[in-house]
Each structure stands twice: as structure tokens, then as C-alpha cells.
């Protein structure tokens, strides 16, 4: 399953419409078009959306490549300091789980925080993934938070 670009936290209806006019309808599309600086610049010129926003959204899209990470958990991970799959693969699951709990207590981003077991699965999966290759066979689903 692939999420619509409007599901990314921070992408409002107006931005989603601009992105769709530029051919970006899904999280997959956003990641493919904006994972590199050149692509972000082109999309920014086409849509008028600042590159810094496109970069933030592409980071969230990157994290959503990992099974179990959807829009809410990608936002929580970003708030906890994890911006990319590469960074996720370097984390210690127990520490990351605690950081996510602390961040969520302060910011109330999700209804629940994933278990250490779930975070361990994410970290292990992230270690096997390339930085900029979308795994089309990898479902992008998030368990209900």
C-alpha cells in the first residue's frame, strides 16, 4: 500500500494540490522526486514549495519505506532525531524507544509509541536497505498507533 502525499504530516491540501500538479501523488512519488537535492530544486521551482519543506517531507517518505512506519511514526522518528533510513539503521533500539517515549510525552504526536521489539525490527530492516532505493515489494503500512 502506498500513502497519498497528503498523508505526510505537514502537507496541507494546498501543498498536496501543487505536488499533484507536478506529478507527485504518493509518498513513493515524493521520495523518488525529492530524495536528491536536484529533484527538490526542480519540484520547488515547479510548485513554489520551499526546498526545506520538500526535504523534510522526503525524509519522512524515506522512513516510510520501512515496514511498520507510516505517517505518524515517521513524524515521531523525525522529532526524535531520526531523519533517514540510514540514520535509523545506526540506532540502538532500546535508546531510540526511550527517546521516542520522551518526545511523544512532550509533543503528543501519536496515540502510542511502538514497542522496543517493533523498533528493533525497524532498525534491523533499515540496516539492509539502500539510502535512495524504493523497495516496491515492501508494503508501506503502519500499525494503528
What are the language-model segments listed below?
Residues 1-145:
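C-terminal extensions
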